[in-house]
A protein has these predicted regions:
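Acidic, divalent-metal-coordinating active-site segment for phosphoryl/phosphodiester hydrolysis
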Residues: 1
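Mid-to-C-terminal catalytic subdomains of enzymes
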Residues: 181
Length: 181
């Protein structure tokens, strides 16, 4: 962010009024802490977005593929609501509260014109979403787990929820590690 910083104790009134942030303790280490926290919050926000978009991509692909293939939709409206409210909430919240990484200040700053969703993040969203959808649809179409017709809706729902939990763990790392490591 482009912000002006003024010293609260030693700074003049003119600089305090012209600046965006006034340091109350006149310590430069406070600036470093603020930058560290800002970068950490930004990274956690990206993790949250990656998780939510992957869940939504896989949900849409599963429902659309089922309809186009002539199968019954795998989820009821109540199950989709449960996935989006109950299932997405806690994992997304924990991704938003991830501890700040130690090396965050060693990385270069984010460019002003950089998108929140990078190309590598977008590819991870779609690859993970399609992977989850493919395994789910394989079960939906072929029943490789051997569930009875009465058990099939429960198996599909549970499978989708478990995949989203794995997705939450996968979203803990953004760009620095290979997928599925």
């Amino acid at each position: 962010a482009d912000v002006g910083i003024a010293m609260g104790i030693a700074g003049t009134e003119v600089t305090k009024e012209a600046s965006d942030i006034v340091l109350l303790d006149d310590s430069f280490s406070t600036i470093m802490k603020a930058v560290q926290w800002g970068r950490g919050i930004y990274e956690n926000f990206k993790r949250f977005i990656q998780f939510q978009l992957t869940v939504n991509v896989s949900s849409v692909v599963v429902v659309v593929c089922s309809i186009l293939a002539g199968f019954e939709t795998p989820f009821t409206a109540l199950e989709l609501l449960w996935i989006n409210i109950i299932m997405d909430g806690p994992p997304a919240l924990t991704l938003g509260l991830e501890p700040i990484r130690d090396d965050i200040l060693n990385r270069p700053p984010t460019r002003r014109d950089e998108n929140i969703i990078s190309k590598s993040m977008l590819s991870r969203i779609f690859v993970n979403g399609i992977f989850i959808s493919a395994i789910f649809m394989l079960q939906h179409f072929t029943n490789f787990l051997g569930a009875s017709p009465e058990q099939e809706p429960t198996v599909l729902f549970t499978m989708f929820v478990v995949f989203q939990l794995f997705n939450a763990f996968n979203c803990r790392e953004l760009d620095r590690t290979p997928m599925y490591k």
